[in-house]
Curated annotation (Swiss-Prot):
Purpose of the protein: Nucleotidase that shows phosphatase activity on nucleoside 5'-monophosphates.
InterPro entries: SurE, SurE-like_Pase/nucleotidase, SurE-like_sf
Family assignment from sequence similarity: Belongs to the SurE nucleotidase family.
EC nos: 3.1.3.5
Name by which UniProt lists this protein: 5'-nucleotidase SurE
Cofactor binding mode and count: Binds 1 divalent metal cation per subunit.
HAMAP family: SurE
Source organism, top-level taxon: Bacteria
Disulfide bond annotation, renumbered to this chain: none
Compartments where found: Cytoplasm
Amino acid sequence: MNVLISNDDGYLSEGIAVLARVTAEFANVRVVAPERDRSGVSNSLTLERPLQLKQAQNGFYYVNGTPTDCIHIGQSVFSDFQADFVFSGINRGANMGDDTLYSGTVAAATEAYLMGIPAVAFSLNDASGRYWATAEQALWTLLAHFFKTPPQSPILWNINIPAVAPEDVRGIKIARLGRRHHGQNVIPARNPRGEQIYWIGPVGEVSDREEGTDFGECGAGFITVTPLQIDLTAYPDMAETAAFWHAD
């Protein structure tokens, strides 16, 4: 069984090392990841320049592109390796609620799913680096169950691991996406030349962390698994939209 692994934090990140190390105990692994941090690039493709694929001393491959680029290259370049599954992560920081629309970690899994490959995105609800032991232990539990009876149908799962001590993880919950408030305004500044520049402001506060949401359950110490879908059609609004446009 072959697993292609990518992320958006780059091939040198601690999270992808943990994910590759644990997954290798269950399957054949190939890592194709961005050469640097590409957080927040969502499903973007590199179209304005050619891409290069290189191999690091640890055996990981890296690309001067986005996570989505990495999935395309990983599935196209290697004649000796075709993925049965794609794993993305482990992201340094959560990917919950609206974050999933921006996340390169989730995007790598999404791109694989669009190719017909079952895919899982993994994130740790912590950016401090204090809880990698929790992430690794959780991953052992998750993958032991996953590979015992691997999913047969196409899946796209978003998994978030709580920022608690390993012994304090309370189990697994299936959760829906929560919501954030609108992000904060851009921050104006001046560069050393006195020119006007702008920084994108911080993300908004969580507005929906009710029981059953990824924000709520992961914050309470549970590993959350959220099944995602690609179809963005608002089916309940179809009739109202047709009436507005006087269309069928």
